[in-house]
A protein has these predicted regions:
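Immediate flanking context of iron-sulfur cluster ligation sites
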Residues: 1-8
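A short, conserved structural fragment
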Residues: 338-348
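Short, amphipathic alpha-helical interaction segments positioned at domain boundaries
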Residues: 355-370
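C-terminal scaffold of the Radical SAM
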Residues: 1, 22-45, 50-324
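Short amphipathic alpha-helical interaction segments
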Residues: 323-338
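Local cysteine-cluster metal-coordination motifs and their immediate loop/turn environment
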Residues: 9-20
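Minor-groove-contacting beta-hairpin "wing" of winged helix-turn-helix DNA-binding domains
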Residues: 349-353
């Protein structure tokens, strides 16, 4: 079982919060597409013997790609890998790209799940984030996707934006729930240095919300979405029954995945590979970076990903994979969190209750082996 990821780095406009690798040089799209086909051929042995169960186009803005280009990549991959049992093929999309004709083309290309970057239903907030669309366009995009036959749609929201909590956040939550999507990703804003928000913060013109506001907004999101029937199954992810994100689960559960495209990462459980974060270098065939994970690295990776999910750490599995001594040390470090209720042990698993996910980074850091 494995996942296949395609990174489409191109954007028409750079969002104020985004620190993913991206490029506005749309004239290079054809060159990157050709290089992605080349990389598929070069790395066909990476997934040999594996069944590809999920495929994902992320970015960037993958919805800038024509359906024919997406279909070409999927067909090429199917010639090299066993994709016959692929249960989920996702495309990240901006609302203003999703016309009726484009959506029909996506369906014909084999896309069966859309991840729509709504972020907010407040137009002033969207302007602050330098998003291309309006709230009305977001609503229209989801409705158009549903009319086109998409029955598995996830919508992205961002909270923790200074000045846009309270009623603004409530409008966004009510708005997304009114659309009848099956999955919602709600991310807390992180102000990264190499972003427009980060540069404004360095000049004293922008300040992240404080911890009290973060917790209040996190709980507002959690309480509102779970009350509407969504399961809070990972730090930033909520799903109706049967609609968890299968591809993202490959990251959280250590499943092997191959990343194709500029800045794409691959992981096989023991080694991590990453492509050049440069369109020009990628097109030129720059070699991938590589890191061989030590046993300690693999343990920390397991702790980090497992504690982001509602299932948490399987204590028996952890002992078998990493040794009883390592597990005992981790449980010693976990004792204060268990006493406070931040961590719980039930049915052989140690996990954070979803309402405590906001502090997961602090807990994970404390349990790391240094």
């Amino acid at each position: 079982m494995a996942g296949l990821y395609f990174h489409i780095p191109f954007c028409k406009r750079i969002c104020a919060y985004c620190d993913f690798y991206k490029s506005v040089r749309l004239e290079q799209m054809d060159g990157v597409t050709a290089a992605m086909h080349r990389e598929l051929d070069e790395r066909q042995d990476y997934l040999r013997g594996e069944a590809v169960t999920t495929r994902y186009f992320g970015g960037g803005t993958p919805s800038l790609y024509a359906p024919a280009a997406l279909k070409g990549l999927l067909n090429h991959a199917a010639q090299l890998f066993d994709c016959s049992g692929a249960a989920e093929t996702t495309l990240e999309a901006n609302p203003d790209d999703l016309t009726g004709d484009y959506l029909a083309g996506l369906r014909e290309a084999g896309i069966d799940r859309l991840s729509i970057g709504i972020q907010s239903f407040d137009d002033d907030c969207l302007k602050l984030m330098n998003r291309r669309h309006t709230a009305a366009q977001a609503i229209g995009a989801v409705r158009a996707a549903q009319r086109a036959g998409f029955g598995n749609i996830t919508a992205d929201l961002i909270f923790g934006i200074p000045g846009f909590g309270g009623d603004s956040l409530k409008r966004s939550l009510d708005g997304v729930l009114s659309l009848g999507v099956q999955h919602i990703s709600a991310y807390h804003l992180t102000v990264e240095p190499d972003t427009a928000f980060g540069r404004r913060a360095a000049r004293g013109e922008f300040r992240a919300v404080d911890e009290e506001v973060s917790e209040e907004e996190f709980l507002t999101v959690h309480d509102t979405l779970t009350a509407a029937g969504f399961e809070h199954y990972e730090v930033s992810n909520y799903a109706l029954p049967g609609f968890r994100a299968r591809h993202n689960a490959s990251y959280w559960h250590g499943t092997k995945y191959l990343g194709i495209g500029p800045a794409a990462h691959s992981f096989d459980g023991e080694e991590r590979h990453w492509n050049a974060s440069s369109v020009e270098k990628y097109i030129a065939g720059a070699p991938a970076g590589k890191e061989v994970l030590t046993r300690r690295d693999r343990f920390n990776e397991y702790v980090m990903t497992a504690l982001r999910t509602v299932e948490g750490i399987d204590l028996e599995e952890a002992a078998a994979r990493f040794g009883a001594k390592r597990l005992a040390r981790m449980q010693e470090e976990a004792a204060p969190f268990l006493r406070s209720g931040t961590l719980r042990i039930a049915r052989g698993r140690m996990a954070l209750p979803p309402e405590k996910f906001l502090v997961s980074d602090a807990v994970i850091g404390a349990l790391f082996e240094t």
